[in-house]
């Protein structure tokens, strides 16, 4: 039996997920009211016109996931349709701050979304 490691998964990057030729992405972060860093990825249509306002959608992830998974796919597809989208790692998950890791605290999560609106 041969055992191997998928390098992209082992390194924690998202090279194995869907990418669009019509969307630019940028890794960003901001702080919530608890001074915790919230990690996120901004998705912008490549045809974005400077100075024009665009509709925006903030995309969270399901429990047990991170922004690179389904939230990133939804954010990409919405950006292909002309939306500015922001996929975030909720506090205690992924690249966001918070201990203990993987905690479920909906009151903090709601503040993450509020801070995401302020960021946009």
Question: How should each PLM-predicted stretch be described?
Answer:
Residues 1-10:
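N-terminal membrane-anchoring alpha-helices
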Residues 67-70, 93-120:
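Catalytic nucleophile-loop/oxyanion-hole region of alpha/beta-hydrolase
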């Amino acid at each position: 039996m041969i055992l191997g490691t998928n390098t992209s998964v082992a390194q924690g990057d998202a090279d194995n997920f869907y990418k669009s030729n019509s969307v630019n992405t940028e890794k960003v972060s901001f702080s919530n009211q608890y001074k915790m860093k919230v990690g996120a990825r901004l998705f912008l249509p490549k045809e974005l016109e400077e100075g024009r306002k665009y509709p925006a959608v903030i995309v969270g992830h399901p429990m047990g996931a991170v922004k690179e998974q389904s939230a990133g796919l939804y954010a990409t597809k919405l950006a292909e349709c002309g939306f500015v989208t922001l996929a975030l790692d909720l506090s205690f998950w992924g690249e966001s701050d918070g201990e203990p890791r993987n905690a479920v605290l909906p009151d903090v999560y709601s503040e993450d979304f509020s801070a995401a609106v302020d960021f946009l």
